Amino acid sequence: MVEILDYTKALEVLKEYPGDGLHVDTLLDSDSHGALTYNDFLILPGSITFPASDVSLETRVTRRFTIKAPLLSSPMDTVTEHSMAIHMALLGGLGVIHNNCPPDEQAEMVRKVKRYENGFIQDPIVLSPETTVGEAKELKTKWGFGGFPVTEKGTLHSKLLGIVTSRDIQFHKNHEDPVTAVMATDLVTAPAGTTLAEANEVLRSSKKGKLPIVDKDGSLISLLSRSDLMKNIHYPLASKLPSKQLLCAAAISTHDADKVRLQKLVDAGLDIVVVDSSQGHSTFQIAMIKYIKQNFPDIDVIGGNIVTREQAAALIAAGADGLRIGMGSGSACITQEVMAAGRPQAAAVRSVSAFAARFGVPTIADGGVQNLGHIVKGLALGASAVMMGSLLAGTTESPGEYFMSSEGQLVKAFRGMGSIAVMEDKSKSGAGNNAGASRYFSENDKVKVAQGVAGSVIDRGSITQYVPYLVAGVQHSLQDIGVQNLDALREGVNNGTVRFEMRSASAQTEGNVHGLHTHEKKLYSS
């Protein structure tokens, strides 16, 4: 007969047992059961002692840059252009602008991100007295905002005459009239030396849309915008520099020709460059990383893609500030099938991240993310952040138009950068290198070997609702695991207090919806 113990001694008796579940190294012992991916395991729950709202997701994405939501959008031409990059940054993540376009077009997208939100705007668009109403309307259409200061010479450090707002020009019929005929001259200004906090307070109380900062001679030296003040209130997690500009990243290839592209991106205000290649351990990438670090020391470099410690060591030694992990795991990628090269994502993320952490280099788990749980698993295995392609491709902010599928569903086009559709598309790359062909070392091949496919993804609405769902979901997951931030998650995994369990095929079936005649899978409400 089994002895029934005193229930008050339960915690004491528990000490007689080894920890439930598996240590991460046992879980990922490929000698025992082969390499794993995200669906092959679960994280065991811990103890909840705090609300989910107290969970911090702040993380480093490179050596120098920190973001508050560990989410990045992929540099694919059906995922990230300026609209996606702006909104990812506003929501605490980071968008990486694709390079399958002419350099000037990509630089213009970077410029739009950097101009979207500011503290003191040090390089505002300034009009001269000769600028016409029509020209002001064109500038508003180009940049997506109105409210342009007018100075005597049409430049900064020239005497301020007035401000032209969207309301001033919206219904003005004569496009040939000078802006001086419609501009506002009853301005509230602040003197040089005013702090940002003081200037924001003046802006709040003035009820004006813009606050020009002027020197003792009345010359314009910078500008503050009410819309930026409102963005600070509405987007508290925004990824920003101390100057209050949004953080911006963009991709380039490993080709020497892209050194010119890089210069244009830097001139536009780029913060982080992603050297984009399907196989990052190449002499071309190593040379490009060294070139960037030598010539642009203020720009952080993310190298990749890689899946082994050996690849990681080469890029870290070259000076990479961050690493992108994943080869053949993306939803639109067929590299593993066609090239017989790659690695299951869970094994790759753990191996590379554990090694890179010894050098203080953050890693990004790129590919294989099919749902919210996969994001958490990538982070638990050591990634500082997770990069998404197909999960974001169907959102309002991704490039392209919605269309109706043959099944009557609203969808958007989505294609892997290794697909023939990208490699043969000359409409985006223009006269420059095709980014898809460059990424897969195929630009000079007579026969293009596809490493990706083209298709469509279902409408996911706006990322202004979708990304907050992902953030809240990760917070609740960490609460279930019993850790309050990502550093604690990684520390718990490394020291064995955060435990794992393998999943059989039957366990995976059990852990999904089953046994219902019909069901509706609604992921979130807001």
Curated annotation (Swiss-Prot):
According to UniProt, the reaction catalysed is: IMP + NAD(+) + H2O = XMP + NADH + H(+)
Arranged from A to Z, the UniProt key words for this protein are: CBS domain, Cytoplasm, GMP biosynthesis, Metal-binding, NAD, Oxidoreductase, Potassium, Purine biosynthesis
Question: Per the record, which residues fall in region Disordered?
Answer: 506-526
One Gene Ontology cellular component annotation? cytoplasm
Q: Where is the composition biased (Basic and acidic residues)?
A: 517-526
User: What is the scientific name of the source organism?
Assistant: Penicillium roqueforti (strain FM164)
Write down the superkingdom of origin: Eukaryota
The taxonomy runs:
Eukaryota, Fungi, Dikarya, Ascomycota, Pezizomycotina
Question: Biological process GO annotation list?
Answer: GMP biosynthetic process; GTP biosynthetic process; self-resistance to endogenously produced metabolite; terpenoid biosynthetic process
Q: Which residues bind K(+)?
A: 328, 330, 333, 506
What SMART domains is this protein classified in?
Answer: CBS (SM00116), IMPDH (SM01240)
Catalytic site: 333, 439
Tell me what gene encodes this.
mpaF
Give the function comment from the record: Catalyzes the conversion of inosine 5'-phosphate (IMP) to xanthosine 5'-phosphate (XMP), the first committed and rate-limiting step in the de novo synthesis of guanine nucleotides, and therefore plays an important role in the regulation of cell growth. Part of the gene cluster that mediates the biosynthesis of mycophenolic acid (MPA), the first isolated antibiotic natural product in the world. Does not play a role in the biosynthesis of MPA, but is involved in self resistance to MPA, since MPA acts as an inhibitor of IMP dehydrogenases.
Residues the record lists as binding IMP: 331, 366-368, 389-390, 451
Any idea what this protein is called?
Inosine-5'-monophosphate dehydrogenase
